[in-house]
């Protein structure tokens, strides 16, 4: 395992730990999810480039599309919760309320 792969896995692990520690605030959770997606993108790109597997060249692009969709939905949810409740607590996202 090269130093680059170890750094990427460390970034993913730190984002995962951040997600577990700061899960009460929606903004912190979204930032940690973005860090996880970015490290997965870099890891997938490096893996495909090092293995010379040409059929999987679209996988990092597809991962970026899903990350952009996740970010857009997350920011829309953050704006809605902030306007409705005045805070960005995840506890405000109770789906049983109408």
Curated annotation (Swiss-Prot):
Its main location: mitochondrion. Gene3D superfamilies: 1.10.287.3510. Its EC number is 7.1.1.2. GO terms for biological process: ATP synthesis coupled electron transport. It is an enzyme of class 7 (translocase). It catalyses: a ubiquinone + NADH + 5 H(+)(in) = a ubiquinol + NAD(+) + 4 H(+)(out). GO terms for cellular component: mitochondrial inner membrane; respiratory chain complex I. It is a multi-pass membrane protein. The chain crosses the membrane at residues 1-21, 29-49, 61-81. It is found in: Mitochondrion inner membrane. GO terms for molecular function: NADH dehydrogenase (ubiquinone) activity. InterPro entries: NADH_UbQ_OxRdtase_chain4L/K, NUOK/Mnh_C1-like. Disulfide bonds: none annotated. Core subunit of respiratory chain NADH dehydrogenase (Complex I) which is composed of 45 different subunits. Belongs to the complex I subunit 4L family. Core subunit of the mitochondrial membrane respiratory chain NADH dehydrogenase (Complex I) which catalyzes electron transfer from NADH through the respiratory chain, using ubiquinone as an electron acceptor. Part of the enzyme membrane arm which is embedded in the lipid bilayer and involved in proton translocation. This is NADH-ubiquinone oxidoreductase chain 4L. It comes from Balaenoptera bonaerensis. The lineage of its organism: Eukaryota, Metazoa, Chordata, Craniata, Vertebrata. The gene is MT-ND4L.
């Amino acid at each position: 395992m090269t130093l680059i792969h170890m750094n990427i896995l460390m970034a993913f692990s730190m984002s995962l730990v951040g997600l577990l520690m700061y899960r009460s605030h929606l903004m912190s959770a979204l930032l940690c999810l973005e860090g996880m997606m970015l490290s997965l993108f870099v890891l997938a790109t490096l893996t495909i480039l090092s293995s010379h597997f040409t059929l999987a060249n679209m996988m990092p692009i597809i991962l970026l599309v899903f990350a952009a969709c996740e970010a857009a939905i997350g920011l829309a949810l953050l704006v809605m919760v902030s306007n409705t409740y005045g805070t960005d607590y995840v506890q405000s996202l109770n789906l049983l309320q109408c």
